[in-house]
């Protein structure tokens, strides 16, 4: 019953989150900025060996001699791990961000302390799923500059990976120069000038390559996810550029202001209704309307559908098969912010409504069901728009 003062006085709660690991980019930054280079080395070796399973890496905290004896390679230099680690973090997170950009998920606070080394989605406080389609959407009302807006999320990943490379720069440069991993105490015993020289080496030989790795990995996963979601998976072969310029970018423009989840769920039925595109467009615009001004018109949607039909025709699959495949990857239900608000309000009432909580939890675990029952169907609607009730870092 203890009230907590945030934007308003609100009821306190204990929230337990579970993840395979809570290590994040910020853990490396913390030790690096303090000059705790042994901690940087031990942490890196731990992540490489225990989290990624790289058995050729010394186990964090293990002596060099013990590691060599265990591996049966006494006297042999241990292979570098730092550049591999950076690239692994980059690839894992790029694939996760690609799914965010496909499903309209907005994290809200993408600082380096909220980006997992495992590539999992963690610490998403003021998160949201996009309702009214707008690539400039912001889900955190503390983010007045739009730093973490939907369209900026990939950019913020590149920024975060840059900061990871900064934190590991002396290690990266040392490994590049010497062709082996650090020994215990070796970086700590080096001079400031040596560490700066190695850091400069790392920036020169690695940074641009890793940035390109983030971009190509993210775009490749993004194109695969979008073509799968749209039922045109075989068209993935035409390349990212055409998928982006001919289908996805025009989708965001044509469907502007319509609810993203409902629009894509309705598109699942389009393969069986391509004979009357104008009627289908009218139905979609009406059903996915989010009540925002200057939203997409029936003509906008119909024009996109005509182009989309040519892509579906190229699949050469029965309409029913396409529809079923699309419904397996296009959710009917997403956990919108107004739903979590309703759950909290019902639990805070004099007679806590735990049944409603359990119903929402069940729907979260089964988002692709049809949910035809009236009460469940209501939870699949736009409800209260995100922009009218945007959470903050303190929510």
Task: Map each language-model feature to its residues.
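ATP-dependent phospho-/nucleotidyl transfer catalytic cores
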Residues: 2-107, 118-246
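Polar low-complexity intrinsically disordered regions
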Residues: 62-77, 105, 111, 299, ...
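Catalytic-loop Lys-Pro-X-Asn motif of eukaryotic-like protein kinases
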Residues: 112-113, 117
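Regulatory N- and C-terminal appendages and interdomain linkers associated
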Residues: 146-395
């Amino acid at each position: 019953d203890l009230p907590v003062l945030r934007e308003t006085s609100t009821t306190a709660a204990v929230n337990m989150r579970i993840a395979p690991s809570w290590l994040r980019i910020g853990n490396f930054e913390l030790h690096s900025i303090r000059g705790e280079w042994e901690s940087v080395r031990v942490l890196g070796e731990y992540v490489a060996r225990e989290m990624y399973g790289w058995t050729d890496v010394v186990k964090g905290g293990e002596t060099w001699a013990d590691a060599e004896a265990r591996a049966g390679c006494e006297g042999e230099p241990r292979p570098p791990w730092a550049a591999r680690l950076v690239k692994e973090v980059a690839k894992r997170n790029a694939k996760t961000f690609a799914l965010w950009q496909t499903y309209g998920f907005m994290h809200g606070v993408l600082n380096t302390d909220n980006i997992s080394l495992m590539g999992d989605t963690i610490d998403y406080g003021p998160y949201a799923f996009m309702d009214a389609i707008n690539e400039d959407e912001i889900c955190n009302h503390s983010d007045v500059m739009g730093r973490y807006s939907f369209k900026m999320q990939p950019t913020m990943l590149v920024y975060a990976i840059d900061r990871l490379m900064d934190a590991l720069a002396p290690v990266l440069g040392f490994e590049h120069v010497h062709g082996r991993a650090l020994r215990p105490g070796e970086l700590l015993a080096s001079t400031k000038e040596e560490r700066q020289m190695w850091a400069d080496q790392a920036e020169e030989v690695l940074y641009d390559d890793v940035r390109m790795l983030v971009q190509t990995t993210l775009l490749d996963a993004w194109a695969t996810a979008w073509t799968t979601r749209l039922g045109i998976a075989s068209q993935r072969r035409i390349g990212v550029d055409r998928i982006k310029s001919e289908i996805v970018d025009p989708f965001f423009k044509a469907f502007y202001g319509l609810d993203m989840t409902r629009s894509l769920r309705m598109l699942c039925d389009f393969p069986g209704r391509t004979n009357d595109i104008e009627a289908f467009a009218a139905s979609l615009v009406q059903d996915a309307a989010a009540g925002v001004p200057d939203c997409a018109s029936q003509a906008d949607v119909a024009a996109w559908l005509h182009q989309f039909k040519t892509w579906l025709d190229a699949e050469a699959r029965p309409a029913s098969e396409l529809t079923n495949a699309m419904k397996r990857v296009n959710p009917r239900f997403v956990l919108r912010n107004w739903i979590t608000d309703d759950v909290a309000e019902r639990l805070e009432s004099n007679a806590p409504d735990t049944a409603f909580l359990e119903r929402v939890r069940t729907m979260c675990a089964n988002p692709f069901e049809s949910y035809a029952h009236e009460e469940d169907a209501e939870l699949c609607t736009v409800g209260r728009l995100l922009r009218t009730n945007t959470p903050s870092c303190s929510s």
